[in-house]
A protein has these predicted regions:
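SEC14/CRAL-TRIO lipid-binding/transfer domains and related phosphoinositide-recognition modules
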Residues: 1-108, 121-147
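Residues embedded in well-ordered beta-strands within globular domains across many folds
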Residues: 114-117, 142
Length: 147
C-alpha cells in the first residue's frame, strides 16, 4: 500500500521504465511491453518503482479481453545498463513480488521475455529473477544478445 502512493496511470517517471506498444492488427497476436533499464537516471528510482510500473500496466490491460486471451511478450533492451542501474532493481523482495504478480495474480498469458544487449553483469540478476518463476515461464526467458 505504501509503495503505491501517487500511482497515476500517466506518471512520466514510470513510463521511462516501460512502454506498451499499440495493439497488433493481427488477431491473436500478443501485446508487447518494452523495458529499457538503462534509459533512466538510477538516482531517481526506487526498486518499488518497477513493481508499480508493471502493476499499472496490468491493471490497465485487464479491461482488454484480447490481452487476456492473446497474452503478452516482454522485450528488454539492456543497452547502457550499468551496475548502478542494477542496484536499483536488484532487490530479491521486489523481484519475487513482480514474478508472483505476473504469473499468479493476474490472468496474463506470458508468451515470452526476450532480452538483448545484456551486459554480463546482468546475468546474475536475471538468474535471481528466474528463481521465482515457474518452469513454464523460465523456459520462455531468452537472451538474444550479450554485450
Amino acid at each position: 500500500k505504501e509503495n503505491f502512493k501517487n500511482s497515476q496511470k500517466f506518471d512520466l517517471k514510470i513510463h521511462r521504465i516501460t512502454l506498451l506498444l499499440p495493439k497488433s492488427k493481427t488477431p491473436g497476436a500478443p501485446r508487447y511491453l518494452i523495458g529499457r533499464p538503462g534509459a533512466f537516471n538510477p538516482d531517481e528510482f526506487k526498486s518499488d518503482d518497477l513493481l508499480k510500473s508493471m502493476t499499472i500496466f496490468f491493471d490497465t490491460l485487464m479491461f482488454d479481453d484480447d490481452f487476456i486471451i492473446s497474452g503478452m511478450t516482454m522485450i528488454g533492451d539492456a543497452s547502457n545498463t550499468t551496475l548502478k542501474h542494477l542496484m536499483v532493481f536488484n532487490n530479491p523482495v521486489v523481484m519475487k513480488k513482480n514474478a508472483l504478480i505476473q504469473q499468479d495474480a493476474y490472468p496474463v498469458r506470458q508468451k515470452g521475455m526476450h532480452i538483448f544487449n545484456m551486459p554480463s553483469i546482468m546475468v546474475s540478476m536475471l538468474n535471481l529473477f528466474k528463481m521465482f518463476l515457474n518452469e513454464k515461464n523460465k523456459s520462455r526467458v531468452k537472451i538474444i544478445k550479450m554485450t
